[in-house]
Amino acid sequence: MEDPNGGQIIFNGVDIADMKVDINVHRRQMGMVFQHFNLFNNKTGVQNIMLAPVYLACRDLRRLRRKNAWIRLTNLFRGGRAKKELLPIETDKAAIKAAAQKNALSLLKRIGLEDKADVYPSTLSGGQKQRVAIIRSLAMNPDVILFDEPTSALDPEMVGEVLDLMKALAGEGMTMIIVTHEMGFAKEVANKVIFMDEGTILESAPPAEFFGTPKHPRLKEFLSKVLV
């Protein structure tokens, strides 16, 4: 969403800031969860989760069909030369939707919201909306999920249910990059904590060192105010 003006961004061994890299390929391996849930109000919980997987799978299906149509056309003019084989297509739109729905319902059950599958976001609490937003990201099977202040828009009593889900994801080995002011959560879950101020990284360390022996004066000042 931002154009870097320097440095590198290495993801799975590839510098995705390189102009030669197809960034869209790597975007499909990343999930994002924002402080505002951004669920579609005109779609049910399960439909919100299904939307991206169905859209991308159907787009890939259309591309395969177009390629096969082109192969059929070119084969008409190959004369005695060997015909090109059609690309295998092992699914259709109905199967794509059925698989996406099955996965979405499984994810809702995982977070205890299977009874909310067919309800609209307007009937959900803030914590429930954010949990649906998180599993909507999981539905794409990402390698990494980026969280931007996922609890900042929630009422205090709803923060815990979202953090518990994120702790469970961390326990399962999901790679997460989290922007947060929840220092207790960061101390418990993170394997590296980075402190930024005015767009600059001032300190980066494992949690025990970050919270136990901070070095930068600005970090010391920050921790003295937020850790009570």
Segments the model singles out, each with a brief description of its role:
Residues 119, 140, 172:
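Conserved signature/switch motifs of ABC ATPase nucleotide-binding domains
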Residues 180-181:
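H-loop/switch region of ABC-family ATPase nucleotide-binding domains
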Residues 7-14, 18:
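Conserved ABC transporter NBD signature motif
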